[in-house]
């Protein structure tokens, strides 16, 4: 008891010394520190104002008291006091007062250190100053010679910073109480997550719009069970926390009627000893656990500076953890639990649900019919059709043990028979042949499909007189091809195994037939188009997907506007069409091929356009620049940069022009006709006579016209082609 009282006196002695220093300035005047006043430290700033009016009386009193014993050393740094102005000292100047009892109060601090210490002592730094002043007073009593002045270079707040870093390192350790807090946060997050799902389907929404929303009943039921499970786990956490706080608590028999206990009966809850020392005192917890701890038995150890004052309470780590956990629980779920509440008061409804019938919380689907022994899902229809008398008879039979046994055996026999029947049906289905060789009514490999395909091919190849009939034939072929894919599904819907096999056969045969038919039709449609629209000007592009009907209508409108030049255009376009039908080239490829060889055509007596092309190709061949480029191209189709620069310098051309010439030349060689030789010969033999006659007739018509009209017709045809 004496040591506890002495501890409290120690904590309050600083304030008492401070009061005596202010009131009895003549007796204990060492609290006035002029050097600290100059540096604006925390002690002088908190106890003494710096202006002359507030500080003059106390300063004069101190100077009068020490007038006889005051001695000044003959140093050139001594500064005299001016009564009218404040005392000012430089950073290293100081004034010594002889005969004072305390030596540790005359400390020299720089302005920077004084300012930083005053900042550190903001808020809770006053207690540290009080403890430091008390320690200085004790040291002054022990020392005999007060005249020596020792300057302390370490500020008061410097070791406190180091201890803070140590405390931070110890807080990071994951102890038992920290793990409890983490688990509690996790459980609360899961509860809020599941509750948000329930709230999303429980709210009515704007004007009841959410009432029509489909509610996932099973999911909502699962969320409710999950919330109950989490609450039970939170209850278990607080139970574990209460058991930890009950370890080493003081028994109730040691307390008197007033709730007080003797200091001799207090022991440490961790080590169990009653030993006390100066720096390792036992501190009682002000929470609900009624335990005491040594300062160094706590983790982290509790220092004297961290002990709260008398009007503030101190909580042990267990009570502190429970307080924080309950605050977190109340803020999250809106409950009102206190630290004094035991774990039985936390979520009693969850425990009641567990005891009252919630043992199957871990099951996803509850079994409501678990106690119903008469339930049989296969006999519902039979029971509904029974008469009242039969129901009474069944009830009377259920009372006897023999009737139960007979019903059980009959039900089991029926189930076995039904299982055997289903097994026989499956065997019959699996025993069916995969290709339906024995089925006389249906044959998936019937020759109708092949006949339809052959008829489609024959229609595409034989019908060359009318284009519309070919389109109609194509539509009928597509319908005929789709029917064998649909019929197997209709005819074999009764047998599952056959339907699967036939659908697989249909899928295997379908894409191959479609791709084969499209390849043939593309060539046949081209031939039909050429035969049907032979005398109409067409485009000479190589794109097979080009919409030829739209192109034909556009060119018909242009041909009507240019009525005078139609014969010339027809003749030149007929020659271009037949020639490019044979070699399958584009306009750009034809222009580049003229550099290598003249364009071949079926008729030698062509129009003016053919004469111009041959003349331009001849000029290009005789051009020395072109010949030089041909020679270099034959040597290397991909020349390097140095070769291109040398050619450009030699032929007086730019490097870009030479590069473009090589690029176009390579493109013209690579874009060779994709038509086979057989198709070319077939087209030659089939149309050579017609083309020659048409070209000859057109040439005769053009020769009869005036020679002046040749140039505008050629330019007009070129403009039309560019469009």
From Swiss-Prot:
Primarily detected in root tissue. Residues 365-407, 435-453 have a biased composition (Acidic residues). Residues 1-10, 580-589 have a biased composition (Basic residues). One of its GO terms (cellular component) is nucleus. Residues 1-94, 135-173, 357-628, 680-723 are annotated as: Disordered. A zinc finger (PHD-type) spans 265-322. GO terms for molecular function: DNA binding; DNA-binding transcription factor activity; sequence-specific DNA binding; zinc ion binding. It is found in: Nucleus. Residues 11-23, 695-705 have a biased composition (Polar residues). It comes from the Eukaryota. Keywords: DNA-binding, Homeobox, Metal-binding, Nucleus, Transcription, Transcription regulation, Zinc, Zinc-finger. Its main location: nucleus. GO terms for biological process: positive regulation of DNA-templated transcription. Residues 58-83, 417-427, 518-530, 547-556, 680-690 have a biased composition (Basic and acidic residues). Residues 614-673 bind DNA. Belongs to the PHD-associated homeobox family. Binds only to large DNA fragments. Recognizes a DNA fragment carrying 8 copies of box7 motif of the light-induced cab-E promoter of Nicotiana plumbaginifolia. Also recognizes the box7m1 motif. This is Homeobox protein HAT3.1. It comes from Arabidopsis thaliana.
